[in-house]
C-alpha cells in the first residue's frame, strides 16, 4: 500500500535499523505501582487493580473480558502478557498479591488467525463452525452465513491492540531488502496513520481533513519513524505534512464515504497482516539452541549447538501450526551505489550466500495442532508428541518461557481440534479441568446442544450442560422433555434451565438452594421432579463432551479441515488375495471361532520387465467353516483393519476366500503375544519398559479414537511384540493385532468369558460397542502389563464373572495411587465418564516422570469377591417357598441402606436340618457356581453365618414364579407357539447341564422359573448330582422326597439316574406345559387314575407295573399329534432308546417353521 512518495532527506534505512534495534530492546516501561494491575488497550478502560490474595491467570482474564465486554466465546483468544519479561502467563499460573508485589500485565489477544476477516482473496477464510456448515466441510469460497470468528467487542479490542503494537514497534515490521524497500515500508506506516485517523474522525463524527491541531499523524505511526522524521529538515517535514493532508482528503472523498467504522477497523487490521508491511503477524517465534526432531526410538539430532548460541527458530501460528528453521543471518542493507560495486567484485560469493540464506529463511512444517497427542515439560525442555509418534524437543531459556510456549500450543489445540482437552497438565486451564470433571461443555450455542441431544437418542431427561455464550456467571442446562397434549400426545421439546454461579456456589435459577460444586447441584437435581410450564420430568443422563467434537467453539481453518480425511464404514474395503498366492503353514492355535496358521504370501514384482517372486511371512486367520454365517462380521473386522495405518497396529495385507474358508492375511510379528513373553521374562522387565508398552498401546488406540473406529478386543494376548527391547535403550516395540470376530456377534456366554476385558455395557448388549469400550479394555490391559501378563479373575467361573460386573467391581489395583487412579478412570462403569485416549497418553507420560515402582508388584492374592453377601445387608421381604428341610425367601440385598439394592432369592436350611442336609446344600452351591446358561437360574453367591457353620444360597429372583404358578394365570396370552418356545429353552438348558455331566433329577414345571413372557429358566438344583466320568449314571443312596411321578422306570427300580432319565422327566414337564399346569391334568392325578388309590411304597410298585405295561400320560387337550409323538419319544422304557435333548430341540424348531 503506497500512499506517499517521500524520498527527500528521508533516511528510511535509518528508520528500519532503529525498528530492528527497538524490537530487540525493552519497550520503554512505566514503573508499575505496588500491587498488580491488568492494563487494557481501550483508552476508556481503567486498569484492573487487584487486592491481596491469590488469583489464577484464567480468573483475571475472565474479569478482564467482563470489563471489556468480551464474550465467553471469544474469551479463549486472550491471555495475559508481561512486557517486561516478554512472557505470556499460562491459564493456571498462580499470581500472589501481597505488600511486596509490583506487577503490570497486559490483557491481549494472543491466539490469532490470519484472514479471519476474509478480505484476502489469496488466502482461505477462517470462521467458527456453525450448525449449518458442519456437514458441508470446508469450502474454497467465502461463506457469508458462517459464524464470524470475532464479536464486535473483540474486534474493537483487537483494533486498539493493533494500533498499540504498531506505534510501540511491537508489530513485526518486515526487514527491507533495499533502500527503496525501506521507503516503501515508511509509506505503508504513513498509510496506516491515514486509516487510524479516518477511523477516529468517523467515531468522533469529525469532518476530514479539518482536524484539531492536536490530532497529528505522528501519533499513529511507529515511534521510531516519528523520531526519524523529527530529525529531518524543516522543509521535508512540512512537505510530508502537506502531502499527508492532501492524501487524507483524497482518501476521505473516495473511500470513507462508502465505508463504516467496522470496515475501517477491518481494513487497518487486514493491512497489518500484509507482507508489504509486516512478516509473521500474529505469530510467535521462539529461539532455541537445541532442537531435536525424532521418530519413535530413532533419534535424529538434526539441530543442536553445544556452544549455546541461538541457531534455530520455532514459529507457532493459528493457520499453519508449528514450524521451524535454522535462524537466517541478518544481511545488512546497503545503499544502491555501494551495492552495485560490491556485486561486481563479489558476485559469486554473494550468490552462494544468498542461496544459503534463502534456504534458511524457508520454514519446515512439523505439526498442525490436531496431530499433537500430548506435551511434556521437563524444566525448560519441551517435548511435543504427534499422532504418528514423531517428536519435537526444544530447549528454551527458562521454565517460564517453556510454560509460555506450551500454553500457546495448548490454546491453539483447543481452538482447532478439541475444545475440551488440554495437552499438558502443567498448563491445564482450571475451567477446562472443571468442565471435564463435571461433564460440562464450553459456551456452545443452543443449536449444537440440541443437535447433540438428538444424536444421542433424545430420551426424556437427557441433558447437556454448557456455559453461557453471553454471561460468564451462568451455566445452561438444555434438557429433552415431552409436553403432554391431549391432541398431539407426547411432543418432544428442548428446554433451557439457568444455573447461576456466584462466589463458587451453584444454584438453579429461582431456587434458594446453593451447592459448593456443580456435581453436588446435579446430584441434588437428579433426585427431584423438575417442572416448567406444563412439563415435568426427571433428569437422567448427562451428554458429556466427546473427543474432537465439532461446535462453534472450534475455528475452521483450511489446515484443520485437511488434516483428517473422512473414512466411511458403509462399504467393505480390503484387498483381495488369490488363493494361489498363499501357502498355509503350521497350525499355531485357535481364536474365537477361528484357526491361526503361519503362512507365506507370494508377492510378484515386475521391475524393469523382470518378474520377481517375493515371499512374505504372514499370519493366516481362518474363519471356522462352521461359522460361515458370521462371514460378513469377519469381513467388517478386516475392512476396519484395512482402513488404518499406524506403526503400532498390525498391517493387514488383505482377505482370501479359499473354497468355503475366509482368511485374513496379516503381518507376521516375530515376538508373538505379549502376555506369553511377559510370563517368560517377568524377572527382566523394568518400569520404563512397561511404560513404553503402555504408551505405544495408548498411541494406537488414540489414533483409532480420532477416526471414530473401535477395536473391541484389546488385551495383552492381542498385543504382538515386534522387538523385545529389554537389553537396549531403544525399548520394546508392540503392535495391536486385529480384533478377530466382532463383539456384536458373540454369544452372551462368549461375552462373559471376556470379563474383565470386555466393557460392562457390551455384556448387557453386545451391539452397544463404542470407543468407550476400548478405554475399559485398556484399563484391564494396563493391569495385565503391571502384573507381568497375569490373567485377572482367572479362577472365577462364568457366573462369578457375571456377578463381578453386576456388583460393579474392578480388579484390585496396584499400590501406586496415580496408576490405580488411571485404571479406575478407564474402568468406569459409566462409559461417558471414561477419559479420552489423548488424556490417557498425557497422564501416562506425567505418571512416568514420577517413576513409580511397578516391577515389584505381585498379583493381588485377595480380590474383591462379589459373590460374598453379608448377612447384615439381607433384608427379608417375604417367603417364596418351603420344603421339609429348607425354605426360600425373597430378600433385598441393600449394602447402601437406601432400599435401592437388588432383590434376590435366598435358600437356606431350617434350624432342625442335620449335617447331611448342609452338605447337600453345599453341593448344590458348588454345582450352581459352575453353571452358566441363559436358561438356567443364575447363581449370585453365598452368605456365611454362625462362624461359617451356616450357609445361605443366593440366587436371582424371578418375580413371575414357576411355570406351575404362571401358566394358569396367563393361559389366555400363551399359545402353542409360545409353549414350544418354552420347551426349546428348557431343552437347551438341560442339554447344557448334560454336557457338564450333571443330572437334574427334579425337572418339573414347579422347578422351571419364568423370567419374562419370552424366557424361562431351570431352577432348584437340590437333587442335582454329578455323574462320574467312568459311568453313565448316578446311583441314589436315599430317596427322600423323590418326585416319583416324574421319574423314569430305571430311577424307580434301580435308583440309577442317567441323562436320559432327565429326558423322561422333560416329557412329563412338557405334558404339564401343554395342559397349562391344570391340576385336573397333573401327572400325579392322571397316574393315580391309572393305578388306583394307593399310598407309600405300593405307589411306586404299581407305577412301575403300569409303565412296564406301556401305559403313558394321555395326549393333552388340543395338543397336535406331532408334538405328542415327540413327547412319547421321551418315554421309551429303555434309556438308550429315548430321544435326546438335541433331537428334541431340532424337532420343536422344525414345527415352529
UniProtKB/Swiss-Prot annotation:
N-acetylmethionine carried by residues: 1
Bilayer topology annotation: Peripheral membrane protein
Cited InterPro entries: Band_41_domain (IPR019749), FERM_2 (IPR035963), FERM_central (IPR019748), FERM_domain (IPR000299), FERM_F1 (IPR041155), FERM_F2 (IPR041046), JAK (IPR051286), JAK1-3/TYK2_PHL_dom (IPR041381)
Domain (Protein kinase): residue spans on this chain: 582-854, 874-1152
CC cofactor: Mg(2+)
Annotated EC: 2.7.10.2
Pfam family, one: PK_Tyr_Ser-Thr
Positions bearing Phosphotyrosine: 3, 1033-1034
Compartments where found: Endomembrane system
Family: Belongs to the protein kinase superfamily. Tyr protein kinase family. JAK subfamily.
Protein name (record): Tyrosine-protein kinase JAK1
Organism: Mus musculus
Taxonomic path: Eukaryota, Metazoa, Chordata, Craniata, Vertebrata
Amino acid at each position: 500500500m503506497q500512499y506517499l512518495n517521500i524520498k527527500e532527506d528521508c533516511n528510511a534505512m535509518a528508520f528500519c535499523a532503529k525498528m530492528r534495534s527497538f524490537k530487540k530492546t525493552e519497550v520503554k516501561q512505566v514503573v508499575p505501582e505496588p500491587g498488580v494491575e491488568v492494563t487494557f488497550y481501550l483508552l476508556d478502560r481503567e486498569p484492573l487493580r487487584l487486592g491481596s490474595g491469590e488469583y489464577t491467570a484464567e480468573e483475571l482474564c475472565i474479569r478482564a473480558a467482563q470489563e471489556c465486554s468480551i464474550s465467553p466465546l471469544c474469551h479463549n483468544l486472550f491471555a495475559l502478557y508481561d512486557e517486561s519479561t516478554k512472557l505470556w502467563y499460562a491459564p493456571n499460573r498462580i499470581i500472589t498479591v501481597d505488600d511486596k508485589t509490583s506487577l503490570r500485565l497486559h490483557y491481549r489477544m494472543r491466539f490469532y488467525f490470519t484472514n479471519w476477516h476474509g478480505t484476502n482473496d489469496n488466502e482461505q477464510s477462517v470462521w467458527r463452525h456453525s450448525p449449518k456448515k458442519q456437514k458441508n466441510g470446508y469450502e474454497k469460497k467465502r461463506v457469508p452465513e458462517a459464524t464470524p470468528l470475532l464479536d464486535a467487542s473483540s474486534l474493537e479490542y483487537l483494533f486498539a491492540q493493533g494500533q498499540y503494537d504498531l506505534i510501540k514497534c511491537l508489530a513485526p515490521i518486515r526487514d527491507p531488502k533495499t533502500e527503496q524497500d525501506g521507503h516503501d515500508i515508511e509509506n505503508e506506516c504513513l498509510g496506516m496513520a491515514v486509516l487510524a485517523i479516518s477511523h477516529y474522525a468517523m467515531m468522533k463524527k469529525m469532518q476530514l481533513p479539518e482536524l484539531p491541531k492536536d490530532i497529528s499523524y505522528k501519533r499513529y505511526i511507529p515511534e521510531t519513524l516519528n523520531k526519524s522524521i523529527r530529525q529531518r529538515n524543516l522543509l521535508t517535514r512540512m512537505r510530508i505534512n502537506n502531502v499527508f493532508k492532501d492524501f487524507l482528503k483524497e482518501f476521505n472523498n473516495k473511500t470513507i464515504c462508502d465505508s463504516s467504522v467496522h470496515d475501517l477497523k477491518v481494513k487497518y487490521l487486514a493491512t497489518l497482516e500484509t507482507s508489504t508491511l509486516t512478516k509473521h503477524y500474529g505469530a510467535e517465534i521462539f529461539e532455541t539452541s537445541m532442537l531435536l526432531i525424532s521418530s519413535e526410538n530413532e533419534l535424529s539430532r538434526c539441530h543442536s549447538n553445544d556452544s549455546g548460541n541461538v541457531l534455530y527458530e520455532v514459529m507457532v501460528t493459528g493457520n499453519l501450526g508449528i514450524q521451524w528453521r535454522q535462524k537466517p543471518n541478518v544481511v545488512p542493507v546497503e545503499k544502491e551505489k555501494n551495492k552495485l560495486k560490491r556485486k561486481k567484485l563479489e558476485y559469486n560469493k554473494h550468490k552462494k550466500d544468498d542461496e544459503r540464506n534463502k534456504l534458511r529463511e524457508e520454514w519446515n512444517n512439523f505439526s498442525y495442532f490436531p496431530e499433537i497427542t500430548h506435551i511434556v515439560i521437563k524444566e525448560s525442555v519441551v517435548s511435543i508428541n504427534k499422532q504418528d509418534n514423531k517428536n519435537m524437543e526444544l530447549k528454551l531459556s527458562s521454565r517460564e518461557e517453556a510454560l509460555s510456549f506450551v500454553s500457546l500450543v495448548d490454546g491453539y489445540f483447543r481452538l482447532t481440534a478439541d475444545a475440551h482437552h488440554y495437552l499438558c497438565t502443567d498448563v491445564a486451564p482450571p475451567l477446562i479441568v472443571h468442565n471435564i470433571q463435571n461433564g460440562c461443555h464450553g459456551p456452545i450455542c443452543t443449536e449444537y446442544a440440541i443437535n447433540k441431544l438428538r444424536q444421542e437418542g433424545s430420551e426424556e431427561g437427557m441433558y447437556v450442560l454448557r456455559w453461557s455464550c453471553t454471561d460468564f456467571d451462568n451455566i445452561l442446562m438444555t434438557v429433552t422433555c415431552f409436553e403432554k397434549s391431549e391432541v398431539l400426545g407426547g411432543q418432544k421439546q428442548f428446554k433451557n434451565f439457568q444455573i447461576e454461579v456466584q462466589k463458587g456456589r451453584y444454584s438453579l435459577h429461582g431456587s434458594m438452594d446453593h451447592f459448593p460444586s456443580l456435581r453436588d447441584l446435579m446430584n441434588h437435581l437428579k433426585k427431584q421432579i423438575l417442572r416448567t410450564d406444563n412439563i415435568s420430568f426427571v433428569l437422567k443422563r448427562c451428554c458429556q463432551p466427546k473427543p474432537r467434537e465439532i461446535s462453534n467453539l472450534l475455528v475452521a481453518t483450511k489446515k484443520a479441515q485437511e488434516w483428517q480425511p473422512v473414512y466411511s464404514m458403509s462399504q467393505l474395503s480390503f484387498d483381495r488375495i488369490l488363493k494361489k498366492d498363499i501357502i498355509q503353514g503350521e497350525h499355531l492355535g485357535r481364536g474365537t471361532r477361528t484357526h491361526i496358521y503361519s503362512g507365506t504370501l507370494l508377492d510378484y514384482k515386475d521391475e524393469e520387465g523382470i518378474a520377481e517372486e517375493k515371499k512374505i511371512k504372514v499370519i493366516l486367520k481362518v474363519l471356522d467353516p462352521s461359522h460361515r454365517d458370521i462371514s460378513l462380521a469377519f469381513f467388517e473386522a478386516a475392512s476396519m483393519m484395512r482402513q488404518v495405518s499406524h506403526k503400532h497396529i498390525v498391517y493387514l495385507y488383505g482377505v482370501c476366500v479359499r473354497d468355503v474358508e475366509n482368511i485374513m492375511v496379516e503381518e507376521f510379528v516375530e515376538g508373538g503375544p505379549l502376555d506369553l513373553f511377559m510370563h517368560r521374562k517377568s524377572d527382566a522387565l523394568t518400569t520404563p519398559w512397561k511404560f513404553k508398552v503402555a504408551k505405544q498401546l495408548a498411541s494406537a488406540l488414540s489414533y483409532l479414537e480420532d477416526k471414530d473406529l473401535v477395536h473391541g478386543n484389546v488385551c495383552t494376548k492381542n498385543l504382538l511384540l515386534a522387538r523385545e527391547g529389554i537389553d537396549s535403550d531403544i525399548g520394546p516395540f508392540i503392535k495391536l493385532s486385529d480384533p478377530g470376530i466382532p463383539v456384536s456377534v458373540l454369544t452372551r456366554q462368549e461375552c462373559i468369558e471376556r470379563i474383565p476385558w470386555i466393557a460392562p455395557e457390551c455384556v448387557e448388549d453386545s451391539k452397544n460397542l463404542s470407543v468407550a469400550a476400548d478405554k475399559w479394555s485398556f484399563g484391564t490391559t494396563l493391569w495385565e502389563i503391571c502384573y507381568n501378563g497375569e490373567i485377572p479373575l482367572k479362577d472365577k467361573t462364568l457366573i462369578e464373572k457375571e456377578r463381578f460386573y453386576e456388583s460393579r467391581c474392578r480388579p484390585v489395583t496396584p499400590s501406586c495411587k496415580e496408576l490405580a487412579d488411571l485404571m479406575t478412570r478407564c474402568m468406569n462403569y459409566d462409559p461417558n465418564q471414561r477419559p479420552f485416549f489423548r488424556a490417557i497418553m498425557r497422564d501416562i507420560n506425567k505418571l512416568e516422570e514420577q517413576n513409580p515402582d511397578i516391577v515389584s508388584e505381585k498379583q493381588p492374592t485377595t480380590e474383591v469377591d462379589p459373590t460374598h453377601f453379608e448377612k447384615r445387608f439381607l433384608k427379608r421381604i417375604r417367603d417364596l417357598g418351603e420344603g421339609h428341610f429348607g425354605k426360600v425367601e425373597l430378600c433385598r440385598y441393600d449394602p447402601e441402606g437406601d432400599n435401592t439394592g437388588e432383590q434376590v432369592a435366598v435358600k437356606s436350611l431350617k434350624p432342625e436340618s442335620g449335617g447331611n442336609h448342609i452338605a447337600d446344600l453345599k453341593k448344590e452351591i458348588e454345582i450352581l457356581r459352575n453353571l452358566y446358561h441363559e436358561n438356567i437360574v443364575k447363581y449370585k453367591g453365598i452368605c456365611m453365618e454362625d462362624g461359617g457353620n451356616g450357609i445361605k444360597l443366593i440366587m436371582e429372583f424371578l418375580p413371575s414364579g414357576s411355570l406351575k404358578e404362571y401358566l394358569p394365570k396367563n393361559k389366555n396370552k400363551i399359545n402353542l407357539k409360545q409353549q414350544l418356545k418354552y420347551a426349546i429353552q428348557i431343552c437347551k438348558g438341560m442339554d447344557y447341564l448334560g454336557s457338564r455331566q450333571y443330572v437334574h433329577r427334579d425337572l418339573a414345571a414347579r422347578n422351571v422359573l419364568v423370567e419374562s413372557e419370552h424366557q424361562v429358566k431351570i431352577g432348584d438344583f437340590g437333587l442335582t448330582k454329578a455323574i462320574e466320568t467312568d459311568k453313565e449314571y448316578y446311583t441314589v443312596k436315599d430317596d427322600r422326597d423323590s418326585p416319583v411321578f416324574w421319574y423314569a422306570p430305571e430311577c424307580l427300580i434301580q435308583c440309577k439316574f442317567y441323562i436320559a432319565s432327565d429326558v423322561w422327566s422333560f416329557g412329563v414337564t412338557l405334558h404339564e406345559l401343554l395342559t397349562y399346569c391344570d391340576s385336573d391334568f397333573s401327572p400325579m392325578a392322571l397316574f393315580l387314575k391309572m393305578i388306583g388309590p394307593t399310598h407309600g411304597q405300593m405307589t411306586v410298585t404299581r407305577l412301575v407295573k403300569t409303565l412296564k405295561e406301556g401305559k403313558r400320560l394321555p395326549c393333552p387337550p388340543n395338543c397336535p399329534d406331532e408334538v405328542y409323538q415327540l413327547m412319547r419319544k421321551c418315554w421309551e422304557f429303555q434309556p438308550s432308546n429315548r430321544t435326546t435333548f438335541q433331537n428334541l430341540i431340532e424337532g420343536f424348531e422344525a414345527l415352529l417353521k
